[in-house]
From Swiss-Prot:
ANK repeats lie at residues 64-93, 97-133. Involved in the regulation of innate immune response. Acts as negative regulator of Toll-like receptor and interferon-regulatory factor (IRF) signaling pathways. Contributes to the negative regulation of transcriptional activation of NF-kappa-B target genes in response to endogenous pro-inflammatory stimuli. The gene is Nfkbil1. The modification Phosphoserine is found at S150. Residues 150-159 have a biased composition (Acidic residues). It is found in: Nucleus. Residues 204-228, 257-270 have a biased composition (Basic and acidic residues). Keywords: ANK repeat, Nucleus, Phosphoprotein, Repeat. Its main location: nucleus. GO terms for cellular component: nucleoplasm; nucleus. This is NF-kappa-B inhibitor-like protein 1.
Amino acid sequence: MSNPSPQAPEEEASTSVCRPQSSMASVSRRHRRERRFRRYLSAGRLVRAQALLQRHPGLDVDAGQPPPLHRACARHDAPALCLLLRLGADPAHQDRHGDTALHAAARQGPNAYTDFFLPLLSRCPSAMGIKNKDGETPGQILGWGPPWDSAEEEEDEEVSKEREWRQKLQGELEDEWQEVIGRFEDDASRETQEPESFSAWSERLAREHAQKQRRQQLEAEGSRRPPRAEGSSHSWRQQEEEQRLFRERARVKEKELCESRARRAQEAQGDRGPAPPRARPRAEHPRGAGRGSLWRFGDVPWPCPGGGDPEAMAAALVARGPPLEEQGALKRYLRVQQVRWHPDRFLQRFRNQIETWELGRVMGAVTALSQALNRHAEALK
């Protein structure tokens, strides 16, 4: 009768010991390859880095402290940033300080806005709302300030009602704008139709705002005290004058756009040579028919014609508002202008209307104008 072999438990024990050792060796190899991948990026050997990731697709392109995207922004290495985004790097990945790649790009100043900040923002817009351990968002580092729909400040009853109405109006306008865009996208014949122009949209917005303000003024006339009636009428006249100037500037800008489109069409016709005799075409092309419908820097409806110094544009906007003696009315007027020229709002609303190669210059001017308006508002506190 043969006894059971005592080597069986020993073999099982050796197998169980080898398994974690093999797993640890695999993890160690992966970490070495990830370090090699980061060294290739730092040395500018992008082809080697891409080939290494193709041979070992399981590597984590966001591994390391700081992560590779943060290093590329800090070194102003635009090719490495483009390669990392193409390989699937996450712009929302945070380092040990809670910073995302957008935080790192924002700290590099205005020179890094076009090559680093805009590509990261286009890949992951939601990262704009991520705060680091200091409670800062990328927009706050750039000096944009918090969006007005997230500001938490104690105000009196009248200002609170106006802010609530402004947020409601903004939401309705955004919903209506999205609905208009969706209708034109679903319509097969949209090339033969003209969507609502910028001047018509601005006039409609000003008209609805004036009607709303007039209704609120009529409802509140019975409850307001006589000494405040004169100040209210004066503030109302200031608002009407500001709206009239805004509509006039929008009409002038629309006229300039039409002349610019006609001039570009004539230049294009001259490059193609004389055309056979036929009926003269319309000078204004349908929207979306060519690049002539997109804005350049001078086509943007700046507060001053052609743009210029941000401080001068901010001073022009303040000069159109109520006098300095009416602090409350002037603060409300400045809040309206800050919302209108906030970089996030401007980029969301007009990004598709601006030439791509002019986008960085336009957004730089809008950011500077927004910061100048913020300084004027801070001076009134």
